[in-house]
Each structure stands twice: as structure tokens, then as C-alpha cells.
Swiss-Prot record:
It is an enzyme of class 4 (lyase). Its EC number is 4.3.2.1. One of its GO terms (biological process) is arginine biosynthetic process via ornithine. Its main location: cytoplasm. The keyword Lyase applies. InterPro entries: Arg_succ_lyase_C (IPR029419), Argininosuccinate_lyase (IPR009049), Fumarase/histidase_N (IPR024083), Fumarate_lyase_CS (IPR020557), Fumarate_lyase_fam (IPR000362), Fumarate_lyase_N (IPR022761), L-Aspartase-like (IPR008948). It comes from Dinoroseobacter shibae (strain DSM 16493 / NCIMB 14021 / DFL 12). It catalyses: 2-(N(omega)-L-arginino)succinate = fumarate + L-arginine. This is Argininosuccinate lyase. Belongs to the lyase 1 family. Argininosuccinate lyase subfamily.
Length: 463
């Protein structure tokens, strides 16, 4: 342990300085320096409010404002010397401000604690990330809509259990992802609206005796209102957890689509050709074109889900109000946000540049007994069979075709009638994949008319 008296800004109560190991475990400047702009924005708003309330002289407020702008410039240009001994971004900024303007720097913290300061900084940062995610999702949605519009009537197999189920259209499949990512965007927007309450002025946990105007600082920082309970304001990390939860669901959707692109771009499927710009090669096999962007999205998603679980685990046992455990909130969120933004950008680029191979899609749709359900529906509609009986007849015909090595449309009428004598020649009309998708005109169905209507609706909604 150090024998010298602590010179930390909180060191008045301590007779000795912290051990080097204590300094190492306590310091967060290695990562929370990312909050520099938000920290300085919050301090500028706080100083302006203190002056407005007569707590700080206008002269001191101006010196603080100018000094903070200088500090921000030094940080943004790489000239700022961060110190681990000063623990965090708040103390680093304040110490440098004191070097620049002297005694007025010590007045900035009036009516404020690092507890409400960091909660405000972190909220501002997460809010910025929600806005960035919204922009990334919007770009991805527009890329998906372009694919859907181009392939509204391109028939492809729809799958369950990764086995051919029913024919759908390329546009319909793309629109499924539009719906997913639009929900993700809605979750991000909901989280942003809910978190837009300002903790600044809550002080350590109980509020302050200084006559602060918390509405003024909230407005200056773009919040809707000040947080209503000072204890909750400094204890709350729901905003970070909501961001991580929304990011985790979005990440899961990105991973599902990445998985499909990996499969679809394989030589065994050939459904899509990925752009060279989002593929890599092999160091030994010259023929290889690997879907590495999609594979890396699929892999990186675990970091986002892991961050969500990690922060839940940090917060689950904490009494109110602040505990040092909460310092561990930021690295998880920083990494998750970085990963999400990169994954969104990579997916948008892949979707924008990829080419759907229409011939391969339609060839695959025409195999695998994809119109078996259409046959069963025809038996119900035209022959008035109960669906379970129609299901059995169709299954028998599928087994017959499978034994012959052909598909349902390749069976003769006589072969079909050997299973059910009332089957007529017009049954073959429903066995074509184009007729199948065209018939699915229910709202939200795969019929090209429905797909085009959904594309138009979403284009209008997104602007």
C-alpha cells in the first residue's frame, strides 16, 4: 500500500494513497474515454444552468465553457494525456479543466455527483447508438425492399426443417426479413423514447439542496424531462439493458439471414451470388469464393447476446443506489454497439449487391413435391374430401411419385386415379408452382400481387 496521502479528488478522507493494484482494478479510463463528448456536453449544460440559477457567476461559467471546449478539442485531436490515476473520464476532464482555468473548475461539480454524471453520460451515448442503429436498419430495410420489388414474382422453394415445403416468391422471402428488421427498428425507437429522461441533478442519490433547474439541463441535452426519482435515476441501467435486449433480437435476425446467405450461395443451392466485395478466397484452393462476411456476422452475434447476459448478471444483485459493480456496464455495451453497427453495415452491403439466381430458384421450387399442399387443397375444394382424407390421398401420391423418381406433375392422370378415382385432369393446373404462388392471395400471402402491395406499403411508410 502507498504510504503517501491520496491526492485523488475524493482523497480528503484518506490517510494513504491506493495500492497500485487498487488503481488498476478501479480505473475505467481505458474504456470510458469514449464518453468524453457526452461528459463535456453534460458539464456544459450543468454549468450554464448553475449560472442561470445564480449558483455560478457568469464569468466562471464562461471560463468553464471555454475550458471544456478546449478539453474536447484536445481529446478529439489526440492531444489529451489520459491518466489512469485519475480513474475515469469525469476526473480526467475535470483535472485538465483545472489546469486550464484554475479555481472555477472546482465549482463545476456543485449540485452534482459522479453518480448522476455517469448515468447522464451513458444515457446520452446509448441514445446516440440507438439513433445510429435506426439509420443502419433503415438502410437495410431499403436494400431488402429493392430485392423484394425486383423478385416479386420469382418463384422459389419455401422451407420447413430446411426441406422443401411450399413454393413462395423471392419477394415474399425478402419481405419476411423486412418485417423482422422493422420490428427491431420499432424496439430501438421504443427504448429510446422510454430512456429519454435526464438523470442530471439527481446528485449522489437523494437530490441536492441547491436550487437546480433540472428541466433546463434536460432540455439542453435533448431529453424529454428530468428523471422523476433521484434514487432510481442513479441506480437505473434499464436503458442499457433495453438497448442490449433490442440489439440481441436484431442480432438474432441478422444471424438467421446470414445463415441463409451462406447456404444459398453454396454450389449445392446457387440461389444467390454474393458480391466479390463481400466475399473472400482461399490461400490454397483457387476456385473458392467464401461468404466470409455472412459467416462473421453469424459468429459475431454471440458477442451481443453475451453482453446482454453479462450486464443482466452485473445488475441482478445490486442494492440501490450506486455500486462500483456498475462500472462494468460500459465495456459490454460499447462492444455490443460496435458489433451491431458493423453487422448491420455488412448485411446491408451484401443484400444491396447480391444477385438472386432466378433460374436456380425456380428449378428448386419445381422439385421436392412443393405443390403437395395445393393438391390436398384441390381435393378438399373440388371433391369435398375432409382435409385429413385429402392429406392421406396426397401422401400416397407423393410416395408413388417418389418411388418412380418423379415429381407430382409427372404422374399420369391414370396413376392419380388409381389412388382416388374422382381426380380429374384439371388437377394438373394446381400442381404448377407459378399457379400455386399466384393463388396465395390472402393478406400477407406469397402471391406476387400481395408482395407488390406490401412493398408499396413499406416504401410509403419508410419514406
Amino acid at each position: 500500500m502507498s504510504d503517501t496521502k491520496s491526492n485523488a479528488m475524493w482523497g480528503g478522507r484518506f490517510a494513504a494513497g491506493p495500492d497500485a493494484i487498487m488503481e488498476a482494478i478501479n480505473a475505467s479510463i481505458g474504456f470510458d474515454r469514449r464518453l468524453a463528448r457526452q461528459d463535456i456536453d453534460g458539464s456544459r449544460a450543468h454549468a450554464a444552468m448553475l449560472a442561470q440559477q445564480g449558483i455560478l457567476s457568469s464569468k466562471d461559467a464562461e471560463a468553464i465553457r471555454e475550458g471544456l471546449l478546449t478539453v474536447l478539442s484536445e481529446i478529439e485531436t489526440g492531444q489529451f494525456a489520459f491518466s489512469a490515476a485519475l480513474e475515469d473520464i469525469h476526473m480526467n476532464v475535470e483535472a485538465r479543466l483545472k489546469e486550464l482555468i484554475g479555481e472555477p473548475a472546482g465549482r463545476l461539480h456543485t449540485g452534482r455527483s459522479r453518480n448522476d454524471q455517469v448515468a447522464t453520460d451513458f444515457k446520452l451515448w446509448v441514445r446516440d447508438q440507438l439513433d445510429a442503429a435506426d439509420a443502419g436498419l433503415l438502410a437495410l430495410l431499403r436494400a431488402l425492399l429493392a430485392q423484394a420489388e425486383a423478385g416479386a414474382d420469382w418463384v422459389m422453394p419455401g422451407f420447413t426443417h430446411l426441406q422443401t415445403a411450399q413454393p413462395v416468391t423471392w419477394g415474399h422471402h425478402m419481405m419476411a426479413y423486412v418485417e423482422m428488421f422493422a420490428r427491431d427498428r420499432g424496439r430501438m425507437q421504443d427504448a429510446r423514447a422510454r430512456m429519454n429522461e435526464c438523470p442530471l441533478g439527481a446528485a449522489a442519490l437523494a437530490g441536492t439542496s441547491f436550487p437546480l433547474d433540472r428541466d433546463a439541463t434536460a432540455q439542453a441535452l435533448g431529453f424529454d424531462r428530468p428523471a422523476a426519482n433521484s434514487l432510481d435515476a442513479v441506480s437505473d441501467r434499464d436503458f442499457a439493458l433495453e438497448f442490449l435486449a433490442a440489439a440481441s433480437i436484431c442480432a438474432m435476425h441478422l444471424s438467421r439471414m446470414a445463415e441463409e446467405l451462406v447456404i444459398w450461395s453454396s454450389a449445392q443451392f446457387r440461389f444467390v451470388t454474393l458480391s466479390d466485395r463481400f466475399s473472400t478466397g482461399s490461400s490454397i484452393m483457387p476456385q473458392k469464393k467464401n461468404p466470409d462476411a455472412a459467416e462473421l456476422i453469424r459468429a459475431k452475434i454471440g458477442r451481443i447476446v453475451g453482453a446482454n447476459v453479462a450486464l443482466l448478471t452485473v445488475m441482478k444483485g445490486l442494492p440501490l443506489a450506486y455500486s462500483k459493480d456498475m462500472q462494468e456496464d460500459k465495456e459490454q455495451v460499447f462492444d455490443a454497439a460496435d458489433t451491431l453497427m458493423l453487422a448491420l453495415a455488412a448485411m446491408e452491403g451484401m443484400v444491396r449487391d447480391m444477385t438472386a439466381n432466378r433460374a436456380s430458384l425456380e428449378d428448386a421450387a419445381a422439385s421436392g413435391f412443393s405443390t403437395a399442399t395445393d393438391l390436398a387443397d384441390w381435393l378438399v375444394r373440388e371433391l369435398n374430401l375432409p382435409f385429413r382424407d385429402a392429406h392421406h390421398v396426397t401422401g400416397t401420391l407423393v410416395a408413388m411419385a417418389e418411388a418412380k423418381g418423379c415429381d407430382l406433375p409427372d404422374l399420369s392422370l391414370a396413376e392419380m386415379q388409381s389412388v382416388h378415382g374422382a381426380i380429374r385432369a384439371d388437377v394438373f393446373e394446381v400442381l404448377g408452382v407459378h399457379n400455386s404462388v399466384a393463388s396465395r392471395t390472402s393478406y400477407g400471402g406469397t402471391a406476387p400481387s400481395q408482395v407488390r402491395a406490401q412493398v408499396a406499403r413499406w416504401k410509403e411508410r419508410l419514406g
